[in-house]
Amino acid sequence: MSGPLARIGRVAVTEWGLALRSRRALVVTLLFLAVSCLVMYCTISIFAALEREVVTALRLPPSETTGTVSMALWKSPIFVRIMDHFAGNSLVFADIRGRHPILLAYAMFLFQVVPLLTLLVSASRVADDVRNGTARYWLVRVTRTEWSLGKFFGEALMLAAAMGVGALAAWGVVLCRLPAADGLRTLPGIVDWTVRAWMYAIAWLGLFLGLSHVVKSGGKAMALGILALLGAAAWSLMLENVSGLSDCLSGLTHLDVLVPEASWPLLWRRSPSAVLQGAVQLAAIAFLYLALGAAVFRRRDV
Protein backbone atom coordinates (compact mmCIF):
# COMPACT_ATOMS: atom_id res chain seq x y z
CA MET A 1 0.00 0.00 0.00
CA SER A 2 2.90 2.37 -0.70
CA GLY A 3 1.84 3.84 -4.06
CA PRO A 4 -0.20 7.05 -4.31
CA LEU A 5 -3.13 5.30 -6.01
CA ALA A 6 -3.16 2.60 -3.33
CA ARG A 7 -3.18 5.20 -0.56
CA ILE A 8 -5.99 7.14 -2.25
CA GLY A 9 -7.96 3.91 -2.60
CA ARG A 10 -7.41 3.08 1.05
CA VAL A 11 -8.79 6.45 2.12
CA ALA A 12 -11.80 5.96 -0.19
CA VAL A 13 -12.54 2.49 1.21
CA THR A 14 -12.23 3.79 4.78
CA GLU A 15 -14.69 6.55 3.92
CA TRP A 16 -17.16 3.81 2.98
CA GLY A 17 -16.49 1.96 6.23
CA LEU A 18 -17.04 5.06 8.35
CA ALA A 19 -20.27 5.83 6.51
CA LEU A 20 -21.57 2.30 7.08
CA ARG A 21 -20.63 2.25 10.76
CA SER A 22 -22.30 5.59 11.34
CA ARG A 23 -25.31 4.48 9.26
CA ARG A 24 -24.97 7.67 7.24
CA ALA A 25 -24.80 5.73 3.97
CA LEU A 26 -27.90 3.71 4.92
CA VAL A 27 -29.90 6.82 5.82
CA VAL A 28 -28.96 8.61 2.60
CA THR A 29 -29.72 5.55 0.47
CA LEU A 30 -33.10 4.97 2.11
CA LEU A 31 -33.94 8.66 1.73
CA PHE A 32 -33.15 8.64 -1.97
CA LEU A 33 -35.00 5.34 -2.42
CA ALA A 34 -38.13 6.70 -0.75
CA VAL A 35 -38.07 9.95 -2.71
CA SER A 36 -37.50 8.10 -6.01
CA CYS A 37 -40.46 5.80 -5.37
CA LEU A 38 -42.69 8.69 -4.31
CA VAL A 39 -41.80 10.83 -7.32
CA MET A 40 -42.29 7.98 -9.79
CA TYR A 41 -45.59 6.96 -8.16
CA CYS A 42 -46.94 10.54 -8.24
CA THR A 43 -45.75 11.06 -11.82
CA ILE A 44 -47.51 7.94 -13.06
CA SER A 45 -50.66 8.89 -11.13
CA ILE A 46 -50.66 12.32 -12.80
CA PHE A 47 -50.22 10.73 -16.23
CA ALA A 48 -53.10 8.34 -15.50
CA ALA A 49 -55.39 11.20 -14.47
CA LEU A 50 -54.49 13.23 -17.56
CA GLU A 51 -55.10 10.23 -19.81
CA ARG A 52 -58.55 9.72 -18.33
CA GLU A 53 -59.40 13.36 -19.00
CA VAL A 54 -58.13 13.15 -22.60
CA VAL A 55 -60.03 9.94 -23.27
CA THR A 56 -63.22 11.43 -21.83
CA ALA A 57 -62.87 14.72 -23.72
CA LEU A 58 -62.17 13.04 -27.07
CA ARG A 59 -64.69 10.26 -26.45
CA LEU A 60 -62.11 7.58 -27.10
CA PRO A 61 -62.32 4.02 -25.85
CA PRO A 62 -60.57 3.74 -22.47
CA SER A 63 -57.05 2.31 -22.49
CA GLU A 64 -56.39 -0.87 -20.54
CA THR A 65 -52.99 0.30 -19.28
CA THR A 66 -51.60 3.64 -18.15
CA GLY A 67 -49.05 5.16 -20.50
CA THR A 68 -50.47 4.12 -23.86
CA VAL A 69 -52.29 7.39 -24.52
CA SER A 70 -49.39 9.51 -23.21
CA MET A 71 -46.90 7.79 -25.50
CA ALA A 72 -49.21 8.17 -28.50
CA LEU A 73 -49.65 11.90 -27.81
CA TRP A 74 -45.92 12.39 -27.22
CA LYS A 75 -45.12 10.93 -30.65
CA SER A 76 -47.97 12.63 -32.51
CA PRO A 77 -46.95 15.20 -35.18
CA ILE A 78 -49.22 17.91 -33.72
CA PHE A 79 -47.68 17.61 -30.25
CA VAL A 80 -44.17 17.56 -31.72
CA ARG A 81 -44.86 20.78 -33.64
CA ILE A 82 -46.21 22.45 -30.48
CA MET A 83 -43.13 21.45 -28.47
CA ASP A 84 -40.84 22.53 -31.32
CA HIS A 85 -42.44 25.96 -31.18
CA PHE A 86 -41.95 26.37 -27.42
CA ALA A 87 -38.46 24.82 -27.40
CA GLY A 88 -37.23 26.87 -30.32
CA ASN A 89 -36.02 23.77 -32.17
CA SER A 90 -33.30 23.25 -29.58
CA LEU A 91 -30.88 20.38 -29.99
CA VAL A 92 -31.86 19.02 -26.59
CA PHE A 93 -35.53 18.73 -27.53
CA ALA A 94 -34.62 17.16 -30.86
CA ASP A 95 -32.63 14.49 -29.01
CA ILE A 96 -35.23 13.69 -26.33
CA ARG A 97 -38.10 13.56 -28.84
CA GLY A 98 -39.65 10.11 -28.87
CA ARG A 99 -38.32 9.03 -25.50
CA HIS A 100 -40.89 7.80 -23.03
CA PRO A 101 -42.32 10.72 -21.01
CA ILE A 102 -42.02 8.74 -17.77
CA LEU A 103 -38.28 8.40 -18.34
CA LEU A 104 -38.00 12.11 -19.04
CA ALA A 105 -39.94 12.92 -15.88
CA TYR A 106 -37.56 10.73 -13.87
CA ALA A 107 -34.57 12.40 -15.53
CA MET A 108 -35.90 15.85 -14.62
CA PHE A 109 -36.34 14.68 -11.03
CA LEU A 110 -32.77 13.37 -10.91
CA PHE A 111 -31.16 16.52 -12.25
CA GLN A 112 -33.12 18.65 -9.80
CA VAL A 113 -32.45 16.55 -6.71
CA VAL A 114 -28.81 15.45 -7.12
CA PRO A 115 -27.34 18.80 -5.98
CA LEU A 116 -29.37 18.56 -2.76
CA LEU A 117 -28.47 14.89 -2.31
CA THR A 118 -24.80 15.70 -2.79
CA LEU A 119 -25.08 18.57 -0.31
CA LEU A 120 -26.58 16.28 2.35
CA VAL A 121 -24.08 13.49 1.75
CA SER A 122 -20.79 15.31 1.36
CA ALA A 123 -20.84 19.00 2.27
CA SER A 124 -19.51 18.56 5.81
CA ARG A 125 -17.28 15.50 5.43
CA VAL A 126 -13.85 17.15 5.39
CA ALA A 127 -14.70 19.76 8.03
CA ASP A 128 -16.13 17.11 10.36
CA ASP A 129 -13.03 14.92 10.04
CA VAL A 130 -10.77 17.87 10.78
CA ARG A 131 -12.85 18.86 13.80
CA ASN A 132 -13.07 15.38 15.38
CA GLY A 133 -9.42 14.51 14.77
CA THR A 134 -9.91 11.78 12.15
CA ALA A 135 -7.92 13.81 9.65
CA ARG A 136 -4.85 13.76 11.92
CA TYR A 137 -4.80 9.96 11.84
CA TRP A 138 -4.62 9.96 8.06
CA LEU A 139 -2.36 12.94 7.50
CA VAL A 140 0.60 11.18 9.14
CA ARG A 141 0.13 8.26 6.71
CA VAL A 142 -0.82 9.97 3.44
CA THR A 143 -0.30 13.40 1.92
CA ARG A 144 -3.04 15.99 2.13
CA THR A 145 -3.64 15.76 -1.61
CA GLU A 146 -4.05 11.97 -1.40
CA TRP A 147 -6.42 12.33 1.53
CA SER A 148 -8.54 14.90 -0.33
CA LEU A 149 -8.72 12.71 -3.45
CA GLY A 150 -9.58 9.65 -1.36
CA LYS A 151 -12.44 11.52 0.30
CA PHE A 152 -13.66 12.67 -3.12
CA PHE A 153 -13.69 9.20 -4.70
CA GLY A 154 -15.23 7.61 -1.61
CA GLU A 155 -18.09 10.11 -1.62
CA ALA A 156 -18.52 9.71 -5.39
CA LEU A 157 -18.96 5.95 -5.00
CA MET A 158 -21.42 6.47 -2.16
CA LEU A 159 -23.51 8.76 -4.36
CA ALA A 160 -23.42 6.16 -7.14
CA ALA A 161 -24.67 3.47 -4.75
CA ALA A 162 -27.53 5.63 -3.42
CA MET A 163 -28.61 6.68 -6.91
CA GLY A 164 -28.36 3.09 -8.16
CA VAL A 165 -30.67 1.82 -5.41
CA GLY A 166 -33.08 4.67 -6.15
CA ALA A 167 -33.06 3.77 -9.85
CA LEU A 168 -33.95 0.13 -9.13
CA ALA A 169 -36.75 1.25 -6.81
CA ALA A 170 -38.13 3.63 -9.45
CA TRP A 171 -38.03 0.82 -12.01
CA GLY A 172 -39.99 -1.39 -9.62
CA VAL A 173 -42.71 1.26 -9.42
CA VAL A 174 -42.80 1.43 -13.23
CA LEU A 175 -43.20 -2.35 -13.45
CA CYS A 176 -46.09 -2.31 -10.98
CA ARG A 177 -47.96 0.72 -12.26
CA LEU A 178 -46.99 1.15 -15.90
CA PRO A 179 -46.94 -2.19 -17.73
CA ALA A 180 -47.37 -0.43 -21.07
CA ALA A 181 -43.86 0.95 -20.72
CA ASP A 182 -42.46 -2.57 -21.09
CA GLY A 183 -40.27 -2.89 -18.01
CA LEU A 184 -37.39 -4.66 -19.71
CA ARG A 185 -37.02 -1.79 -22.18
CA THR A 186 -37.51 0.85 -19.50
CA LEU A 187 -34.68 -0.35 -17.26
CA PRO A 188 -31.83 0.65 -19.63
CA GLY A 189 -33.36 4.12 -19.93
CA ILE A 190 -33.56 4.57 -16.15
CA VAL A 191 -29.97 3.34 -15.74
CA ASP A 192 -28.81 5.64 -18.55
CA TRP A 193 -30.34 8.75 -16.96
CA THR A 194 -29.03 7.74 -13.53
CA VAL A 195 -25.47 7.54 -14.84
CA ARG A 196 -25.83 10.93 -16.53
CA ALA A 197 -27.19 12.49 -13.34
CA TRP A 198 -24.27 10.98 -11.40
CA MET A 199 -21.89 12.76 -13.78
CA TYR A 200 -23.72 15.98 -12.95
CA ALA A 201 -23.45 15.23 -9.22
CA ILE A 202 -19.67 14.90 -9.52
CA ALA A 203 -19.31 18.63 -10.25
CA TRP A 204 -21.32 19.53 -7.15
CA LEU A 205 -19.34 17.04 -5.09
CA GLY A 206 -16.08 18.76 -6.01
CA LEU A 207 -17.57 22.15 -5.18
CA PHE A 208 -18.96 21.11 -1.78
CA LEU A 209 -15.82 19.22 -0.74
CA GLY A 210 -13.69 22.15 -1.84
CA LEU A 211 -15.69 24.46 0.41
CA SER A 212 -15.48 21.95 3.26
CA HIS A 213 -11.67 22.19 3.11
CA VAL A 214 -11.65 25.87 4.10
CA VAL A 215 -13.81 25.82 7.26
CA LYS A 216 -13.48 24.14 10.65
CA SER A 217 -17.01 22.92 11.34
CA GLY A 218 -19.60 20.86 9.50
CA GLY A 219 -22.29 23.47 10.11
CA LYS A 220 -20.28 26.18 8.40
CA ALA A 221 -19.50 23.83 5.51
CA MET A 222 -23.21 23.06 5.10
CA ALA A 223 -24.06 26.76 5.17
CA LEU A 224 -21.44 27.49 2.52
CA GLY A 225 -22.85 24.66 0.41
CA ILE A 226 -26.36 26.11 0.58
CA LEU A 227 -25.01 29.54 -0.37
CA ALA A 228 -23.14 27.94 -3.27
CA LEU A 229 -26.36 26.33 -4.54
CA LEU A 230 -28.22 29.62 -4.37
CA GLY A 231 -25.31 31.53 -5.86
CA ALA A 232 -24.97 29.12 -8.78
CA ALA A 233 -28.69 29.45 -9.54
CA ALA A 234 -28.47 33.25 -9.43
CA TRP A 235 -25.33 33.22 -11.58
CA SER A 236 -27.01 31.06 -14.22
CA LEU A 237 -30.04 33.36 -14.34
CA MET A 238 -27.78 36.38 -14.71
CA LEU A 239 -25.83 34.80 -17.56
CA GLU A 240 -29.05 33.94 -19.37
CA ASN A 241 -29.97 37.64 -19.41
CA VAL A 242 -26.52 39.17 -19.81
CA SER A 243 -27.00 39.52 -23.58
CA GLY A 244 -29.21 42.52 -22.92
CA LEU A 245 -26.48 44.33 -20.97
CA SER A 246 -23.56 46.39 -22.21
CA ASP A 247 -20.79 44.94 -24.34
CA CYS A 248 -18.30 45.13 -21.48
CA LEU A 249 -20.50 42.80 -19.42
CA SER A 250 -21.33 40.41 -22.26
CA GLY A 251 -17.92 38.79 -21.73
CA LEU A 252 -19.32 37.26 -18.55
CA THR A 253 -21.03 34.64 -20.69
CA HIS A 254 -17.65 32.92 -21.07
CA LEU A 255 -17.61 32.29 -17.32
CA ASP A 256 -20.61 29.96 -17.50
CA VAL A 257 -18.20 27.02 -17.61
CA LEU A 258 -17.62 27.58 -13.89
CA VAL A 259 -21.25 26.72 -13.07
CA PRO A 260 -22.41 23.05 -13.22
CA GLU A 261 -25.81 24.04 -14.66
CA ALA A 262 -24.11 25.31 -17.82
CA SER A 263 -22.91 21.81 -18.73
CA TRP A 264 -25.87 19.62 -17.84
CA PRO A 265 -27.77 20.22 -21.14
CA LEU A 266 -24.97 18.31 -22.87
CA LEU A 267 -25.89 15.27 -20.77
CA TRP A 268 -29.40 15.32 -22.28
CA ARG A 269 -28.09 14.85 -25.81
CA ARG A 270 -28.18 11.54 -27.70
CA SER A 271 -24.76 12.11 -29.27
CA PRO A 272 -22.04 10.24 -27.34
CA SER A 273 -19.57 13.01 -28.17
CA ALA A 274 -21.87 15.63 -26.59
CA VAL A 275 -22.35 13.51 -23.47
CA LEU A 276 -18.59 12.94 -23.24
CA GLN A 277 -17.97 16.68 -23.58
CA GLY A 278 -20.43 17.38 -20.78
CA ALA A 279 -18.86 14.72 -18.56
CA VAL A 280 -15.37 16.13 -19.13
CA GLN A 281 -16.52 19.68 -18.39
CA LEU A 282 -18.26 18.62 -15.18
CA ALA A 283 -15.25 16.60 -14.04
CA ALA A 284 -13.02 19.61 -14.73
CA ILE A 285 -15.32 21.80 -12.61
CA ALA A 286 -15.20 19.23 -9.80
CA PHE A 287 -11.41 19.00 -9.70
CA LEU A 288 -11.00 22.76 -10.09
CA TYR A 289 -13.00 23.52 -6.94
CA LEU A 290 -11.51 20.54 -5.10
CA ALA A 291 -7.99 21.74 -5.97
CA LEU A 292 -8.76 25.28 -4.80
CA GLY A 293 -10.08 23.98 -1.48
CA ALA A 294 -7.13 21.61 -1.10
CA ALA A 295 -4.71 24.48 -1.78
CA VAL A 296 -6.19 26.39 1.17
CA PHE A 297 -6.22 23.22 3.28
CA ARG A 298 -2.48 22.64 2.74
CA ARG A 299 -1.78 25.93 4.52
CA ARG A 300 -4.03 25.17 7.49
CA ASP A 301 -2.83 23.88 10.84
CA VAL A 302 -4.72 20.64 11.39
Predicted regions and their residues:
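Alpha-helical transmembrane segments of multi-pass membrane transporters/translocases
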Residues: 4, 117, 264-302
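Alpha-helical transmembrane segments of multipass membrane proteins
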Residues: 15, 171-172, 206-210, 230, ...
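Transmembrane helix boundary and interhelical loop/hinge segments in multi-pass membrane proteins
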Residues: 119-138, 152, 302
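Transmembrane helix segments
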Residues: 38-49, 218-258
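Aromatic- and glycine-rich beta-strand/loop motifs that create alpha-glucan
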Residues: 1-32
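Secretory targeting signals
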Residues: 32, 38-124, 148-219, 265-280
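Residue-level recognition of pore/gate-forming positions within transmembrane alpha-helices
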Residues: 32-36, 154-155, 226-230, 286
